[in-house]
């Protein structure tokens, strides 16, 4: 029995989800340029296959980062991103245009998003607390740039929309490759801009009725697996909150297969709920942060397999810890590297204090969260 059929049977007797204003899609939508990414059609059954989907932490652009060329920022993790079938990044900034700015109201150059795409990120998450830093006009321009990049860079985005119809198309975002059909749900607890709720364009909020509607649409579109990517939790806390576990339990009961969260800017603990993996927060990917535990983050690689009978299942997720070194530490720029590759490479560091800070933080976060790589 396939996972989709099993989910349908198991859903009998569960609490019914709220109705949604979005009508069922008669044909699953697919971006035309994804045809190039998917390649030639292959038989659904008759051959074994594996799909990899890698999620990296918060991609930020503080004011000081703008003083440096982007090149080294993600170069150390780009090979892992590029080798994945899909790589996902939380774009924690707007593309609101000039004047460019960092914290507390982020507006990055368009070239920064293009750089992320060059590094292998092909799905941008936009539901975060900073997406309205430049108001509705800033969000509208951000969406406009990402829509252009869909055509020019063959990327996708989710987490925000220009109107209700666009929301139904992007929430969930359906991605397809190798005969797998994956649904992505990206939403945020809120934004830093008050008074804009209910206006368009809009970001997707952490509202159970909306989430349930997105899960319904994922099932209508015959999703093999549903992945939730929430922006939630308490900043700088290494353990999940009560509200996180309550929502996680509810989402798993509703049909979500795996949860990978962001927002706290640190790695949080993980768990399984009914056998489904939950990563409450994977921390930062690149930023100017240097407070305790904010320089370490994770990439989580999700693997989905299909056997020769056509049966699909999720394999054990793979975790890789990363370290974001600031200028003058590892090199003269920002540089995110994979920790395990650098544990015995003290000679690479310009400033040895950062090397030892990386080793201490790596050990402490693993022991505190229980998340091992």
Named regions from a protein language model:
Residues 23-373:
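Acidic, metal/ion-coordinating pockets
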Residues 1-10:
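Bacterial N-terminal signal peptides that target proteins for export
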């Amino acid at each position: 029995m396939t996972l989709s059929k099993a989910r349908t049977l198991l859903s009998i007797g569960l609490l019914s989800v709220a109705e949604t204003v979005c009508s069922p899609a008669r044909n699953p939508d697919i971006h035309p340029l994804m045809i190039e990414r998917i390649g030639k059609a292959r038989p659904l059954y008759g051959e074994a296959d594996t799909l990899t989907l890698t999620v990296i932490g918060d991609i930020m652009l503080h004011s000081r980062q703008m003083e440096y060329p982007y090149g080294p920022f993600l170069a150390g993790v780009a090979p892992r991103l590029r080798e994945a079938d899909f790589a996902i990044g939380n774009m924690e900034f707007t593309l609101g245009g000039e004047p460019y700015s960092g914290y507390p109201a982020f507006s990055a150059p368009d070239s920064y998003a293009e750089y992320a795409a060059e590094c292998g990120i092909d799905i941008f998450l936009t539901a975060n607390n900073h997406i309205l830093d430049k108001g509705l006009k800033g969000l509208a321009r951000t969406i406009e740039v990402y829509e252009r990049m869909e055509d020019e860079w063959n990327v996708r985005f989710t987490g925000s929309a220009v109107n209700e119809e666009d929301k139904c198309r992007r929430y969930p975002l359906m991605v397809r490759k190798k005969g797998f059909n994956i649904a992505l749900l990206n939403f945020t607890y809120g934004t830093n801009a008050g008074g804009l709720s209910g206006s368009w364009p809009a970001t997707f909020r952490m509202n159970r009725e909306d989430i349930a509607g997105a899960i319904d649409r994922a099932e209508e579109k015959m999703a093999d697996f549903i992945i939730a990517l929430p922006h939630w939790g308490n900043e700088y806390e290494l353990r999940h909150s009560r509200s996180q576990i309550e929502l996680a339990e509810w989402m798993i009961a509703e049909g979500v297969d795996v949860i990978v969260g962001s927002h706290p800017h640190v790695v949080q603990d993980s768990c399984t709920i009914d056998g489904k993996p939950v990563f409450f927060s994977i921390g930062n990917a690149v930023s100017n942060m240097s407070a305790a535990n904010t320089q370490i983050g994770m990439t989580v690689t999700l693997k989905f397999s299909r056997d020769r009978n056509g049966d699909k299942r999720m394999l054990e997720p793979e975790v890789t810890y990363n370290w974001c070194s600031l200028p003058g530490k590892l090199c003269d720029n920002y540089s995110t590297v994979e920790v395990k590759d650098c544990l015995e490479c003290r000679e690479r560091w310009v400033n040895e204090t950062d090397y030892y800070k990386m080793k201490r933080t790596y050990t402490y976060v693993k022991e505190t969260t229980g998340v091992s790589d």
